[in-house]
């Protein structure tokens, strides 16, 4: 029996950011040559979520995540949830993210971040899409909010219970890592 092929995937890169304006195609080409078969490009607001989808449409191996980063939470308004839902229905949208809480930079007041995070967790459940979680100095609150979300997923027999998402750029402690693994989250490590 032949061994299973390993599919290399970059689960978090912001290829639509201006940092790549001069060499984006070269970066994508080098990723292909290195054997990377899938790239997930998360949005941080509506504009970058649209850009992530556009890049995904232009490249077979690139997929998008759509979401509002906690430091962009002040951009959330009455239309944002509906616009994100529309973007999330695109066939190349594979996750809701990058979402979560950031108590280090505090680009938005904590209560605003929590409200926006909750709205996006609800959207992920509705759309059946996993989440990409940003957590900076907010471990207890992130775990508490995700506990409630995972409990709702279980109550509703959601397939997301098996793989609810990834804790991006994990900086928590061992207890949080164990908590995440017990709830089937992937843990993303910064390289």
Show where each model-derived region lies:
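Mid-domain alpha/beta scaffold segments of enzyme catalytic cores
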Residues: 1-191
């Amino acid at each position: 029996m032949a061994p299973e092929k390993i599919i290399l995937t970059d689960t978090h890169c912001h290829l639509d950011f201006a940092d790549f304006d001069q060499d984006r195609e070269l970066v994508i080409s080098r990723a292909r040559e290195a054997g990377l078969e899938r790239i997930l490009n998360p949005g941080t607001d509506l504009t970058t979520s649209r850009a992530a989808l556009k890049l995904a449409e232009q490249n077979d191996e690139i997929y998008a995540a759509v979401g509002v980063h906690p430091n962009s939470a002040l951009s959330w308004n009455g239309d944002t949830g509906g616009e994100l839902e529309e973007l999330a229905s695109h066939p190349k949208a594979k996750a809701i993210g990058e979402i979560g809480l950031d108590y280090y930079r505090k680009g938005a007041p904590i209560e605003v971040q929590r409200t926006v995070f909750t709205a996006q967790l609800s959207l992920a459940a509705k759309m059946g899409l996993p989440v990409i979680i940003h957590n900076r100095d907010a471990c207890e609150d992130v775990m508490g909010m995700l506990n409630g979300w995972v409990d709702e997923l279980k109550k509703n027999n959601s397939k997301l219970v098996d793989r609810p998402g990834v804790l991006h750029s994990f900086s928590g402690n061992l207890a949080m890592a164990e908590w995440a693994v017990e709830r089937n989250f992937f843990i993303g490590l910064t390289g």
